[in-house]
From Swiss-Prot:
Secretion signal, residue range per the UniProt entry: 1-19
Gene3D superfamilies in the cross-refs: 1.10.287.70, 3.40.50.2300, Periplasmic binding protein-like II
GO biological process, one term: abscisic acid-activated signaling pathway
Consequences of knocking out this gene: Increased sensitivity to exogenous abscisic acid (ABA) and higher ABA levels in leaves.
Compartments, as annotated in UniProt: Membrane
Protein name: Glutamate receptor 1.1
Entry function: Glutamate-gated receptor that probably acts as a non-selective cation channel. Can transport sodium, potassium, and calcium ions. Functions as a carbon and nitrogen regulator and/or sensor that regulates carbon and nitrogen metabolism and distinct physiological process such as germination through the control of acid abscisic (ABA) biosynthesis. May be involved in light-signal transduction and calcium homeostasis via the regulation of calcium influx into cells.
Amino acid sequence: MEILFSISILALLFSGVVAAPSDDDVFEEVRVGLVVDLSSIQGKILETSFNLALSDFYGINNGYRTRVSVLVRDSQGDPIIALAAATDLLKNAKAEAIVGAQSLQEAKLLATISEKAKVPVISTFLPNTLSLKKYDNFIQWTHDTTSEAKGITSLIQDFSCKSVVVIYEDADDWSESLQILVENFQDKGIYIARSASFAVSSSGENHMMNQLRKLKVSRASVFVVHMSEILVSRLFQCVEKLGLMEEAFAWILTARTMNYLEHFAITRSMQGVIGFKSYIPVSEEVKNFTSRLRKRMGDDTETEHSSVIIGLRAHDIACILANAVEKFSVSGKVEASSNVSADLLDTIRHSRFKGLSGDIQISDNKFISETFEIVNIGREKQRRIGLWSGGSFSQRRQIVWPGRSRKIPRHRVLAEKGEKKVLRVLVTAGNKVPHLVSVRPDPETGVNTVSGFCVEVFKTCIAPFNYELEFIPYRGNNDNLAYLLSTQRDKYDAAVGDITITSNRSLYVDFTLPYTDIGIGILTVKKKSQGMWTFFDPFEKSLWLASGAFFVLTGIVVWLVERSVNPEFQGSWGQQLSMMLWFGFSTIVFAHREKLQKMSSRFLVIVWVFVVLILTSSYSANLTSTKTISRMQLNHQMVFGGSTTSMTAKLGSINAVEAYAQLLRDGTLNHVINEIPYLSILIGNYPNDFVMTDRVTNTNGFGFMFQKGSDLVPKVSREIAKLRSLGMLKDMEKKWFQKLDSLNVHSNTEEVASTNDDDEASKRFTFRELRGLFIIAGAAHVLVLALHLFHTRQEVSRLCTKLQSFYK
């Protein structure tokens, strides 16, 4: 009994010693808020991992004086509720940091409030986006999208691929996080041939199938996918149905997409797909933590890799916060500091340690992790094929592509024949202008003979590249030709003919530089004779009448002024009348010889001769222009207001040179509106019959078609530029268009402007246009008459005074 009593006393004393409070056992508490959607698997993992990590941390570091107290708030997936929860944590609970932000909207709201409260907000869900860089207190603790973008770009360059198709989710956080990748493509010269976006709420199977059919016609063989798990599962079901998981295609998934893909039900339709994943170094600590995390979660994790990534990042965030709190509180700063959050943020930024997810380092408010695992999805599991780190690949292994092929997907390789590659070229065979392109089958052998200006230019441009040409006639519409070339890439490589470069066709194919003059012209018949009264054409009737009236008026005024002092204007009334008319009309040819006595009449004649000089010059110039060029009375806005297709459609099926000429001669057509090459051939054959009176550069000329992304496009374009600079294109035009050097064809904008000016000058002058001259002349006549009447009145007054004095 005494022994039991003694043991009890010792136990009480021992427990008292252990439980007795001391200064060392009083912890300094720092509150941290977790704002997550507790109904989501990511939110549950974050909360569980955070608490488990703190428990492990303080179990090892039980001598630390500080403790991080976790305050959890459920955002319910609503950004507004998340904002309210964060406000409550900062204002009422006095939280010194917040962890959360599962969407871009939440991140922007929490980042805004963190700027005002000067409290750090840490997100483990969102990739780096440009719109969040402006917030100084917002830290993105995810993979480095800049390094990832460089890795994807480098991988595509290894395929020698110059164009890709980008497929992404139509949501703010997904589209924004794609910008860095797009910029890398542009910097490295990778062309985005097509792009498509899909929203979770509106992207059913039919919509996806329609969009993917449009993407299929692009010549790009590499597809980059950036979207959530639910959309990826829908996407690849459609991709498989459309035959886009065959040998000729490559699919690359971004890390944000690939991190959440684990289920076999999803990946079984994705065999051969390549994905970037956040790299997690394998260690016993990682295995131990993830094992305990699954037990805590009750094996409720939906995806293995995603739960590991989120859990390990949450673990490292908890540890770095606990370390940071301890560092600046050793000397009692937690109690003394008035701004714990600012000190905490500064300590986090300068923290360096090795965590479960890798080496921890913060730069520009984002976690730096340049290492990515590259995986290849197989029949049953994912297989690592390499690592991307520090700007280079390592541990590379062979890739098994879609269709179980081990060959790198490329554009269709040209068929080979001996030492030369065969280029299969579609030729427009329905053209009725053989000068441009002509396809004639040999009746005995059946072999097509292809000739014409377009064909000769193409053969000359392609000759340096050692291709054997196989011409295939095509008798359909040129718009359909572009679509055919883009969809039948295994059969055809290029197209040649009178093919105008248009924006619609450029959606399906790539064009070379134009090798013909650009624009549309107006052609009409030259006028042989313009009638016996052509000399009246330069002036309208009103101007002729006004001019005649002023000639007579000038003679009358000069006669009135001069007749009292000048003998040449005196005599009988008949002599005076003839002198008036003679003097007035003789000024037309400046043939007046009479010497004028008074200054006023001389002044009047000088002014009138100036007016006559302008009238005669205008008359001569206008008469000359009407004899030089036959004008077309066209409403240019009506003629050039439509597209090339609508204008040439007015001609129906009339395309042959002879048909044009005959219809113009017999008056069925007054003018022809068509592209410059067609009109050049017509004028070349009949240079004395027709003339081009105007042109507008609203079309892009003829070009050669190639499949999207073809390496031959820049090469052939350079050859076209070389032919033009050497004058060889002009020589070919002379050969096929005949007497081109004698044509009245305008080759540049300045000449067209000059022709327009000549056409305007050939219009009849009206009295309204030259009324300024007659106002000047009229003012001179009125002034001279007024002076004459004033002097006459003085003389009459003096005469009356003399008569009055005589009678007196």
